[in-house]
Regions:
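Short secondary-structure boundary micro-motifs
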Residues: 11, 40, 85-87
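Internal, well-folded beta-alpha domain core
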Residues: 61-223
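Glycine/small-residue-rich interface belts in oligomeric ring/scaffold proteins
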Residues: 18-81
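Short, structured patches in soluble enzyme cores that scaffold and shape functional sites
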Residues: 8-10, 58, 104-106
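N-terminal, Lys/Arg- and Ser/Thr-rich interaction peptides
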Residues: 1-20
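Primarily extracytoplasmic ectodomains and periplasmic/lumenal surface modules that are beta-strand-rich
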Residues: 13-15, 45-49, 109-111
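Extracellular structured ligand-interaction cores
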Residues: 3, 51-53, 97-99
C-alpha cells in the first residue's frame, strides 16, 4: 500500500485531554482526532476519517512544566468581562523536543504537506511545529514486528504503557454550537520518551519501506 511519510518537529508539545478540563496535565500521546486536526490545518479544510487512514509514532526528550500568562474573565453585570485583577499566571505541562512521524494513506495530500495552508501545532498555538520531510513510501502488511510510541487499540499484550480513553474524531460543522464527539475507544499509549520498541502481533501492522530496521512496524488505525 502506498502512503506518505511526513516528519514533523517542534520545541514543545502539549496535547490537552480532549474530553475533560484537565488543568495542567496533558494527554500521553496525540489522539487520532488531534492528528486529523493537524492534517486539516495543512490541507486548509476539515479532513474526515473516511478520507485517509493514519499511523504515527511520537517521541520526545522528556516532560517538563513552564509558567505562562493567562487571560482571566469574571462574570459582572450579566456579562463576561476582563478580570479586575488583570492577567493571571498558571503552570503548563509540556513535552520537550517533540517529533512526530505521520503515515497517511491518502497520497493526494502530499502537496498540502509540502505547502501547508496553516501552521501545524503540537497542541496549543504556541506549540509550533514544522515539517522537515514529506516522502512517498510503501507500507507492507505484516503480522508482527517491533513498534514504538503510538496508540494501540486496547487490549494489546506485550507493551508497557498507559490505558487511555480518546475520541477518534469530532464533528464541528455548525458554527456557534459545541462539537459532537465521535467514537470513544480505549487505547494503550506507549510513553513517548521510551526508546524501547516492543515486539507485538496484531492486525493492521505495516512495515514502512523507509524504516531503519527490517523488523520495525507501525500500526495504521482503522476508523
Amino acid at each position: 500500500m502506498k502512503a506518505l511519510h511526513v516528519h514533523l518537529e517542534g520545541y514543545t508539545a502539549s496535547f490537552r485531554r480532549p474530553l475533560i478540563i484537565s488543568g495542567i496535565k496533558i494527554t500521553t500521546l496525540p489522539a487520532y482526532s488531534t492528528l486529523l486536526g493537524i492534517i486539516s490545518a495543512c490541507v486548509g479544510r476539515t479532513v474526515r476519517p473516511h478520507e485517509t487512514r493514519i499511523g504515527f509514532e511520537f517521541t520526545c526528550s522528556g516532560v517538563a512544566e513552564e509558567i505562562e500568562r493567562t487571560h482571566r474573565l469574571q462574570f459582572e453585570d450579566g456579562r463576561l468581562r476582563a478580570h479586575s485583577k488583570g492577567l493571571g499566571i498558571s503552570k503548563r505541562q509540556m513535552y520537550t523536543d517533540p517529533q512526530l512521524d505521520l503515515y497517511v494513506t491518502n497520497c493526494s495530500l502530499k502537496s498540502a504537506f509540502e505547502h501547508p495552508c496553516a501552521t501545524p501545532c503540537f497542541g496549543q498555538s504556541q506549540d509550533v511545529a514544522w515539517i522537515t520531510n514529506v516522502g512517498e513510501i510503501e507500507l507492507t502488511p505484516v503480522s508482527e514486528g517491533a513498534i514504538g510510541p503510538t496508540l494501540l487499540p486496547y487490549p494489546q499484550g506485550g507493551v508497557a504503557g498507559l490505558i487511555v480513553s480518546l475520541p477518534d474524531w469530532f464533528e464541528n460543522e455548525v458554527r456557534g454550537r459545541t462539537r459532537l464527539v465521535g467514537p470513544i475507544r480505549k487505547f494503550e499509549a506507549i510513553l513517548p520518551f521510551t526508546r524501547t520498541r516492543y515486539h507485538i502481533r496484531r492486525a493492521d501492522l505495516f512495515h514502512p519501506s523507509d524504516a531503519p530496521r527490517d523488523e520495525d512496524v507501525v500500526y495504521v488505525h482503522v476508523w
